Design a protein with these regions (language model features):
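Acidic, S/T/G-rich, low-cysteine, solvent-exposed domains in lumenal/extracellular/periplasmic regions
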Residues: 1-238
Length: 238
C-alpha cells in the first residue's frame, strides 16, 4: 500500500468519521516521510445543521479524539481543538423570512500566502480552532483566520436557534485571528521514529524516521473541501 501511495504527490484526508487504525496511521506517516504531501480536513466537534430539523437545539460534542490521530498531528506540530469558533463576521441562514447572521458559520479571512492569496472570505461550518506546537525544523504559516471579533466556545456545547435572533454583542467576541487553516513545511520527524511499526505493516520497505523536505496543510473544518455553489448569486456563500 505504501508503494501505491507513493505514486501520488498528494493525499487528502477529508472529514473522516471513523477511527484510524494504527496501520492506517503508519501508512500515512510513512507516505509523508517519503516526501508525500498531505491535506487534512478534520472536524474537532460533531455539529450538523440537519440536527435542527428535529428541534430548536442540539448538542455539539467532541469527536476529534475518537479519530485516533491526535498523536500524528501533535508530532507534526498542530492540534485540533474540541471547540467551536463563533465570529461576528459570519454567513447568514434563511429562516424563510429573513437572512440572519449565524455566528457558527464564520467567514474566514485568507492570508497572503500564495496558496490562498486573493481568495474571498471562506465560509466555515461549525469550525474548530487550531493551535500550533513547538516542532523543530517546521515552518508554520497561517492560511485561514477569524476576524478580530471572534471567540471560542468549548464542546460539549448546545447550539440553539435562539442565537439566530439574538444579535451578537461584539464586546463578548474579544478574540482575534483564531486559526482554522495552517501550512506546515520542512523536515518532519516520524510519529513512529521511536515506536515499533504495526506488525501487519510488513517489512517490504524500510521504516523511515525522518522525511525529505515536504509540506502538509491542516484545516479544522471537514466541510471546507465541499464544493458549494450559490446558484442564485455566486458572489455570496451558500
Amino acid at each position: 500500500l505504501i508503494r501505491r501511495l507513493n505514486t501520488f504527490e498528494l493525499a487528502i484526508i477529508a472529514k473522516p468519521t471513523k477511527t484510524f487504525s494504527e496501520l492506517d496511521k503508519y501508512f500515512l506517516d510513512q507516505y509523508a516521510m517519503g516526501g508525500g504531501h498531505l491535506m487534512w480536513f478534520i472536524d474537532g466537534v460533531h455539529a450538523e445543521m440537519d440536527s435542527l430539523s428535529y428541534g430548536p437545539d442540539f448538542l455539539a460534542y467532541p469527536t476529534y479524539f475518537d479519530l485516533n490521530i491526535t498523536d500524528l498531528l501533535f508530532k507534526y506540530g498542530v492540534r485540533v481543538n474540541t471547540d467551536l469558533i463563533q465570529d461576528v463576521r459570519c454567513a447568514g441562514i434563511n429562516d424563510r423570512r429573513n437572512v440572519n447572521p449565524w455566528v457558527y458559520f464564520p467567514l474566514f479571512g485568507a492570508t497572503n500566502h500564495p496558496s490562498v492569496a486573493n481568495l474571498n472570505a471562506i465560509k466555515g461550518e461549525f469550525s474548530s480552532s487550531l493551535d500550533t506546537l513547538e516542532s523543530t525544523g517546521i515552518k508554520k504559516t497561517a492560511l485561514l483566520q477569524s476576524s478580530s471579533n471572534a471567540k471560542r466556545v468549548p464542546a460539549p456545547h448546545t447550539v440553539s436557534l435562539e442565537a439566530l435572533y439574538n444579535r451578537p454583542d461584539p464586546r463578548s467576541f474579544n478574540q482575534r485571528d483564531l486559526l482554522s487553516g495552517v501550512l506546515l513545511e520542512g523536515v518532519f520527524e516520524s510519529a513512529y521514529a521511536n515506536r515499533i511499526a504495526p506488525k501487519t505493516a510488513g517489512a517490504s520497505l524500510p521504516q523511515l524516521k525522518q522525511s525529505n523536505p515536504t509540506s502538509m496543510a491542516v484545516f479544522s473544518d471537514g466541510d471546507f473541501i465541499r464544493n458549494q455553489v450559490n446558484l442564485i448569486n455566486p458572489e455570496l456563500p451558500r
